[in-house]
Amino acid sequence: MRFREGPLGDLKVPLTWTAAVALIVAAVIGVAFLLADRRETLQEQAYGVTRQTVDTVARPVSGAIAAPGRWTGLGLDYVRSYFFTAHENRRLKAELAEMRQWRDRALALQDQNDRFKSLLGLRTDPPIPMAAARVVSDSRGPFANTRLADAGSERGIVVGNPVLNERGLVGRVVGVSRGVSRVLLLTDIASRTPVMIDRTNARAILTGDGGPNPKLDYLRGVDPIQQGDRVVTSGDGGVVPRGLPVGAAVKGLDGRWRVVLFADQASIDYVRILLFKDFAQLADEKQLQARSLPPVTTEDPQTSILSNPVSRPVAPTPSPATATPSAAPAARPATTATPPQTGAPR
């Protein structure tokens, strides 16, 4: 045959012997593994040496045989993790974008909550009722600086009520209707507010001129103000209560004293309106209606001393026509006795 005549014909015997040897070796290895894995009880000592030998030889052989499978598993895990990581990356990016929105919202709510806490922390001495409101409109111009707040007459707000944010005085109410009120800012050209320097109690009028820093007019006293002095409301005239924070004094480029408003340090979005009318509401009504003095009892005008005075008794003066002779004076008693007459006179 051509196969036998060819160069491969000489490989028949080696291939047969190789197959036979491989079969025998496999059988021996199989028997050795069976013996090594056998759970011996009574014959444990008989196969102890064989088991130890098989374990010693099987360890590197098992490692070499298991290496390709292990490498294949690692490769599959890598490919699987690559595609899983790509999918997970896309999912995490979408989640991160969503969480950024929640983060921005949480920061906004935290800022709003802090401002609400600051507004709730506003206290006046003596206490004055307040109404919280949100500024819904901003009207700015070269001459007018006003805001609209979403609280009106239904909440007891009237014209002239002071308006504050969490930092200080903002302005006062100049117009009110149901559900809305107009607030005139301190920077408006029509704004006039009596203030005083907290350090010296020097009085002045805070006058708006349309700029960010209103000026101090009619400042009285000797050296009444210094750079950085705290300016508060004076309460003069009963327009606003005394002691509300306004700002800090600074000297402008024109040489005039001005005020850096505390209210400008925070946005004017949420405000509190003081329901302040006049100083009469600051006093205790019970003290104003204190017990008065007991009433004075008076007599009847007909019998009063003032209307019918009683005359003192006066001795009557006799008239010449009705005059009567006065009685003779009584005889004085004799001091010596007279002898009795016994005979005729001589």
From Swiss-Prot:
Bias (Low complexity): 309-340
Comp. bias regions, Polar residues: 299-308
The keyword Metal-binding is annotated on this UniProt entry: no
Subunit structure: Interacts with penicillin-binding proteins (PBP2, PBP1a, PBP1b, PBP2a and PBP2b). Interacts with outer membrane proteins belonging to the TonB-dependent receptor family of transport proteins.
Broad class of where this protein is predominantly found: periplasm
Protein family: Belongs to the MreC family.
Biological role stated in the UniProt entry: Involved in formation and maintenance of cell shape. Required for the spatial organization of components of the peptidoglycan-synthesizing holoenzyme in the periplasm and peptidoglycan synthetic activity.
Keyword Coiled coil recorded: yes
Name recorded for this polypeptide: Cell shape-determining protein MreC
Region named Disordered: 292-346
GO cellular component terms listed in the entry, alphabetical order: periplasmic space; plasma membrane
InterPro entries: Cell/Rod_1 (IPR042177), Cell/Rod_MreC_2 (IPR042175), MreC (IPR007221), MreC_beta-barrel_core (IPR055342)
Disulphide bond pairs: none
Record GO biological process: Gram-negative-bacterium-type cell wall biogenesis; regulation of cell shape
One Pfam family this sequence matches: MreC
Record localization: Periplasm
Keyword tags: Cell shape, Coiled coil, Periplasm
Coiled coil: 89-118
Phenotypic consequence of gene deletion: Affects the localization of MltA, MipA and PBP2. In the case of MltA and MipA no polar localization is observed, and in that of PBP2 the banded localization pattern is lost. Depletion of both MreC and RodA results in defects in stalk growth and mutant cells expand relative to wild-type cells. They appear to arrest in expansion along the long axis of the cell.
